[in-house]
């Protein structure tokens, strides 16, 4: 994947403003609420019975932070995303059996969360760069499935 200097700047510039705990928790909670079938991968998280329960669930918040922290590894390694996520791809494929389509869904949700948090900074150009990034990350995570 080739990244232009402008794309790199738009991605890293916005990433520097992201509250990983807050945005990660919101992104994962939105995934579980908007796409309820994804909840089956989080059965051990306890109460996911309603949007309020999901938003208040400490395990959802903690895992959301973990997910977005790992997404930060992509931002730091834009030129080596495939290798950055090879172990996570293996884990999600071989051990957790997560449907790779869920990576795309989470990427789309992350775009919505970023747009909601950074209305002025999230220009169409910024969105295009981030859309490319979430697509590349989803593809890297789905790699072991092919």
UniProtKB/Swiss-Prot annotation:
GO terms for cellular component: blood microparticle; haptoglobin-hemoglobin complex; hemoglobin complex. The keyword Glycosyltransferase does not apply. Residues 2-146 form the Globin domain. The keyword Kinase does not apply. GO terms for biological process: hydrogen peroxide catabolic process. Gene3D superfamilies: Globins. Keywords: Heme, Iron, Metal-binding, Oxygen transport, Transport. It comes from the Eukaryota. Red blood cells. This beta chain is from both the minor and the major components, which have been called the Q-I the Q-II component, respectively. This is Hemoglobin subunit beta. The gene is HBB.
């Amino acid at each position: 994947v080739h990244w232009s200097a402008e794309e790199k700047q738009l991605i890293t510039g916005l990433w520097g403003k992201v509250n990983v705990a807050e945005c990660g928790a919101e992104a994962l909670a939105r995934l579980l609420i908007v796409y309820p079938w994804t909840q089956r991968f989080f059965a051990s998280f306890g109460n996911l019975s309603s949007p309020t329960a999901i938003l208040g669930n400490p395990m959802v918040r903690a895992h959301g932070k973990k997910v977005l922290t790992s997404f930060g590894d992509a931002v730091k390694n834009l030129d080596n995303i495939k290798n950055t996520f090879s172990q996570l791809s293996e884990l999600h494929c071989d051990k957790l059996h997560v449907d790779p389509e869920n990576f795309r869904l989470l990427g789309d949700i992350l775009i919505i969360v970023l747009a909601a948090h950074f209305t002025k900074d999230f220009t169409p150009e910024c969105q295009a760069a981030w859309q490319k990034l979430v697509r590349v990350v989803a593809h890297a995570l789905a790699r072991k499935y092919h």
